[in-house]
Regions:
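Conserved helix/coil segment N-terminal to the catalytic DExD/H
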Residues: 1
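Switch II (G3) loop of P-loop NTPases
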Residues: 161-167
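Active-site beta-alpha connecting loops in nucleotide-dependent enzymes
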Residues: 144-147, 170-173, 177-220
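Acidic, Mg2+-coordinating active-site environments of NTP-dependent enzymes
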Residues: 5-161
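Generic hydrophobic secondary-structure packing signal
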Residues: 114-117, 134, 167, 171, ...
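Short, flexible loop segments at the rims of nucleotide/cofactor-binding pockets, characterized by
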Residues: 21-26, 166, 193-197
Length: 220
C-alpha cells in the first residue's frame, strides 16, 4: 500500500495473529499503525470501530493528531452508533443512529463481528462521499463471504452446519459466540490448529473451545 494514494482507511480491532512475523502484539500494533500514520493521505479519513478499547483510542488519537477526518462507529461511535442488535434465525436486526436519525437495518449476516465489519465498511463508503441513508439501506443487500460463518448444509435432523475460517483464539471465540444465539440445542465444534507457525495459540483455542462449545472434536 505504500505506493498507493489512500483516501480512507479503517481500524476494526487487533487480535493475536502473525506473531511469527512481529514477535509480540505490541510490534504487531505498531506495524498496523503505519497505515494511519504514514499511508493515509494528509487530507484523508480514518474510520474506527470505537469498541476495541485501548487500541481504538490510540488510533483515534493518532487521527486527530494528523488532522484527518475521523468517523467512529459502534456502540460508542458518534458517526454511526449501534443502538441495538437483535439476532434472528438467518441474520440480525440493527438499529443505527446517525445524523440525528434512527435507521432500522435487516442485516443478512450472523454474528456481532459481522455487524461490526458491516458498519466499518459503511463508514468507509460515507467517508469517501456516500450518502448515509443510502449506504445504511444497502446493508440489507449484503451476502455472506464464503468461509466466514457460511452455512454449508442443514442436516436431516434440521441442524445447520456452518464453516468459518477462524484460526486465532479471538476469531474462534467470536465465531462460537456469534452462533450461540442461533442454537436451540447443542453447539458442536470441529476445529484444528495445524502447522508450526504459532503453536502458542493452541492452548488458548483449546480453552475457548472447552468453555464455549457443548461438544468439541479436535482434528490433526
Amino acid at each position: 500500500t505504500e505506493g498507493l494514494p489512500v483516501r480512507a482507511a479503517a481500524f476494526t480491532n487487533l487480535s493475536r495473529d502473525h506473531l511469527d512475523y512481529h514477535g509480540d502484539i505490541a510490534n504487531y500494533f505498531t506495524a498496523k499503525m503505519r497505515l494511519f500514520s504514514e499511508v493515509v493521505d494528509s487530507d484523508g479519513a480514518v474510520v474506527v470501530w470505537a469498541d476495541a478499547g485501548e487500541y481504538s483510542a490510540r488510533v483515534i488519537d493518532l487521527a486527530r493528531e494528523r488532522g484527518l477526518a475521523l468517523l467512529t462507529v459502534g456502540e460508542r461511535g458518534s458517526t454511526l452508533r449501534l443502538a441495538e442488535r437483535s439476532p434472528g434465525q438467518l441474520g440480525q436486526q440493527l438499529i443505527i443512529e446517525a445524523e440525528g436519525k434512527t435507521h432500522k437495518i435487516s442485516l443478512p449476516l450472523i454474528g456481532a463481528y459481522q455487524a461490526a465489519n458491516a458498519l466499518v465498511a459503511a463508514g468507509l463508503v460515507i467517508a469517501t462521499g456516500g450518502d448515509v441513508s443510502t449506504t445504511l439501506g444497502n446493508l440489507s443487500r449484503l451476502q455472506p463471504v464464503r468461509g466466514r460463518l457460511e452455512r454449508a448444509v442443514i442436516t436431516q435432523s434440521g441442524a445447520p452446519v456452518y464453516v468459518d475460517y477462524a484460526h486465532t483464539p479471538d476469531a474462534l471465540e467470536a465465531a462460537i459466540e456469534a452462533l450461540r444465539p442461533h442454537c436451540k440445542g447443542r453447539l458442536i465444534l470441529v476445529f484444528g490448529a495445524g502447522g508450526d507457525r504459532d503453536t502458542g495459540k493452541r492452548p488458548e483455542m483449546g480453552a475457548i473451545a472447552a468453555q464455549l462449545a457443548d461438544n468439541v472434536i479436535v482434528t490433526d
